[in-house]
Design a protein with these regions (language model features):
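Short glycine-/polar-rich loops that comprise or flank the Walker A/P-loop
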Residues: 1-2, 13-17, 39-41, 63-66, ...
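Conserved helicase ATPase core of P-loop NTP-dependent helicases/translocases
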Residues: 53-59, 65-97
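Non-catalytic terminal extensions of ATP-dependent helicases
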Residues: 161-249
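Conserved interdomain hinge at the start of the Helicase C-terminal
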Residues: 13-61, 200
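Post-DEXD/H (motif II) to motif III coupling segment of the RecA-like Helicase ATP-binding lobe
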Residues: 1-11, 148, 154-155
């Protein structure tokens, strides 16, 4: 008989790399054109500097593209909340430094964008490792500036035409903050029960619940978020009176 050891099988990185020629001198506009070409898929935009993250964030705000920022210059609490909003799809895009290229818990992604090129092959490889894992395919996009050469490890990437835009849907999810957590003996089931019974929502309207030691975060449709805050704020969850608010950026 033939013995197959499945533990020896290794996940194959199913990754394609593509270059995007800047359509104008405005690199930020090319980035937005690419995001609009890709539609409503979640992805990470990698930058080298905190200043770059800030400028990309301001531009995406103007274009009404929901996003979160993630860098070493932020407080741990703010980084954690950025990831929560990205995981539950309140944010479509995560704008990040290389801190997000390893060791963070995010769902399987279809794409990443190198807004600024990695300084080393190792950083480039770690960034690309966020996509194309396990069974799904992913694409890493590199923004190619005119008269600026790409590193050797990127030069074989095929150029892609991004002139065609996908239909972008409006933001669906919003994140609610609850001021009670595990230390208050609150469970995910307790939170779901509160939203079903007192919030009068359906199962389809309850998104991802993330439970922490002293608080919790719940994704709900943006269209009913304020309504749920009015219904549930200052109610009792287990024995604790909790605040329920919309999580601000």
């Amino acid at each position: 008989p033939t013995t197959v050891n499945y533990l020896e099988e290794k996940a194959v990185l199913k990754l394609e790399t593509r270059t995007v020629q800047l359509s104008s001198k405005n690199k930020l506009q090319t980035l937005v054109d690419l995001i609009e070409h890709l539609g409503n898929q979640p992805g990470i935009v990698f930058c080298n500097l905190r200043d770059s993250i800030d400028s990309v964030s301001r531009f995406l705000d103007k274009k009404n593209i929901k996003h979160s920022c993630f860098s070493g210059g932020m407080e741990q609490k703010d980084r954690e909340r950025a990831l929560i909003k990205f995981r539950n799809r309140t944010s479509q895009i995560l704008i990040a430094t290389d801190l997000a290229s390893r060791g963070i818990d995010v769902p399987e992604l279809k794409f990443i964008i190198h807004y600024e090129m990695s300084r080393t092959l190792e950083e480039y490889t770690h960034r690309n490792g966020r996509v194309g894992r396990v069974k799904s395919k992913g694409t890493a996009y590199v923004l190619k500036e005119e008269n600026r050469d790409l590193p050797e490890f990127v030069k074989n990437s095929r150029a892609v035409n991004i002139s065609k835009k996908s239909v972008r849907k409006a933001q669906f999810w919003e994140t609610l903050f609850i001021s009670g957590g595990r230390k208050d003996k609150i469970s995910k089931g307790d939170i779901a029960g509160l939203f079903f019974k007192q919030g009068n929502i359906t199962k389809d309207q309850l998104g991802i619940i993330e439970l922490k030691q002293d608080c919790a975060f719940v994704a709900v449709p943006k269209s009913i978020a304020d309504q749920l805050v009015n219904k549930l704020n200052n109610t009792r969850l287990k024995k604790k009176k909790v605040r329920v608010t919309v999580l601000q950026s």
